[in-house]
Design a protein with these regions (language model features):
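Hydrophobic h-region of N-terminal signal peptides that target proteins for export
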Residues: 9-18
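Carbohydrate-interacting regions of secretory-pathway proteins
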Residues: 19-197
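Positively charged n-region of N-terminal signal peptides that target proteins for export
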Residues: 1-5
Length: 197
C-alpha cells in the first residue's frame, strides 16, 4: 500500500469518527454525567429517570463533555407533571444554570421552544397547532440541532421551531437535562445520543 492511500484512509477514518453518533447515556448508570442539586436521578430497567426530591427544587444532570455544533436526539416519557428540559451550550454553578433550554413540558406548554436561562427568557415558542405533537404519557423523540447561530428542534418528526441567534452562535458548553422545581415531577429518558456536526 502506498503512503497516499494510507493517508487517505486515515483521514477518512478520522472524519467518520468525528461525525459518529455518541451515546451519552449507556443504559446502565450515570457515567459521563454529573448531578447538580438534590433532586433524584437514577437508572432503572435501562431508563434514566429524574424525579422530584424532598426539596422540590431545580435539579440538573450535566454532561462532562462540551459540544458546539451538534444534533442531539433524546427519547422521553413524562409521568405526573413532566416539566423538564434539555439545555445546550450551558454552564452551571451549583444549581444556577446558564445557557439555552429546549423545553420539555406538559401539553400546551411549549415543548420544543427555546428559553434562555437567566437571560432573555423565551426566544421562540412553537405555534399553537404544533403543541399537539406531544404525546402525553407516551414515548416522544426530540431532536435538537445546533449549527453556528441556528437552532432547530423537532418533536416526533415535526419541526417545532427554527431560530437564529448570534449569542448562541458565539457560545459553547455542556448538555444538561432539567427537573423543574415545585415537586411532583417525573420524566423518563431512554435514549440520549449526540452527533458532532
Amino acid at each position: 500500500m502506498n503512503k497516499t492511500l494510507i493517508t487517505l484512509l486515515l483521514v477518512a477514518g478520522s472524519l467518520v469518527g468525528a461525525h459518529a453518533q455518541i451515546k451519552l447515556f449507556n443504559g446502565k448508570d450515570l457515567t459521563g454525567w454529573k448531578v447538580a442539586g438534590t433532586e433524584k436521578w437514577y437508572v432503572e430497567k435501562g431508563e434514566m429517570i429524574c424525579e422530584s426530591g424532598p426539596d422540590k427544587a431545580y435539579g440538573y444532570l450535566v454532561s462532562e463533555r462540551e459540544f458546539k455544533n451538534f444534533e442531539l436526539t433524546v427519547e422521553f416519557k413524562q409521568e405526573s407533571n413532566g416539566n423538564s428540559g434539555v439545555f445546550f451550550h450551558c454552564g452551571i454553578e451549583g444549581t444556577t444554570i446558564s445557557g439555552w433550554q429546549a423545553e420539555v413540558a406538559p401539553l400546551n406548554h411549549h415543548t420544543g421552544g427555546v428559553y434562555e436561562s437567566y437571560g432573555r427568557g423565551w426566544l421562540i415558542q412553537p405555534t399553537a397547532d404544533k403543541e399537539k405533537v406531544l404525546k402525553e404519557g407516551e414515548w416522544n423523540t426530540m431532536v435538537v440541532r445546533v449549527v453556528g447561530d441556528e437552532v432547530n428542534t423537532f418533536l416526533n418528526g415535526v419541526q417545532m421551531i427554527t431560530l437564529k441567534d448570534e449569542k448562541i452562535g458565539a457560545s459553547t458548553g455542556k448538555i444538561a437535562l432539567q427537573i423543574h422545581d415545585g415537586g411532583g415531577v417525573k420524566v423518563r429518558w431512554r435514549k440520549v445520543e449526540i452527533k458532532a456536526l
